[in-house]
Design a protein with these regions (language model features):
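A beta-strand edge to alpha-helix "cap/lid" segment located at domain peripheries
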Residues: 1-122
Length: 122
């Protein structure tokens, strides 16, 4: 499997971990330096994101990801795509479609997400 395929597998695992609230999988996929930039400009580190899932504050009922464009630069990969998620965050229901950018690094042979950002679309 080449690097592009490996990153796409990691992206799929990321989506499924969110959908199934699989905290251990999320922890494994997130780099210690992970930083999420939300649509509103908020920045959350790895522990903040994991805490929001552990508390039940956030959960997804549906998730889809498509239109992936992957670029690999040595041990770094950038993925641009489109996703849709439906669920609840901080007590509020959402049905969200966005373009996203995620950045992955390969450490000890494993791809880890170091950052992701999404921008809402209609």
């Amino acid at each position: 499997m080449d690097a592009v395929e490996q990153v796409l597998v990691a992206e799929r695992e990321w989506l499924l971990a969110h959908l199934h609230l699989d905290i251990p999988a999320l922890e494994q996929l997130m780099d210690p330096d992970y930083l999420q930039i939300g649509a509103g400009g908020d920045a959350l580190d790895k522990e903040q994101v994991l805490a929001s899932f552990r508390s039940g504050e956030r959960h997804w009922d549906e998730a889809q990801s498509a239109e992936h464009h992957v670029r690999v630069y040595g041990n770094t990969a950038v993925v641009v795509g489109r996703w849709r998620a439906r669920g609840e965050n901080a007590g509020r229901s959402f049905d969200y479609q966005a373009r996203f950018v995620s950045v992955w690094v390969r450490r000890d042979g494993e791809w880890r997400m170091v950052s992701d950002q999404s921008t809402p679309i209609a």
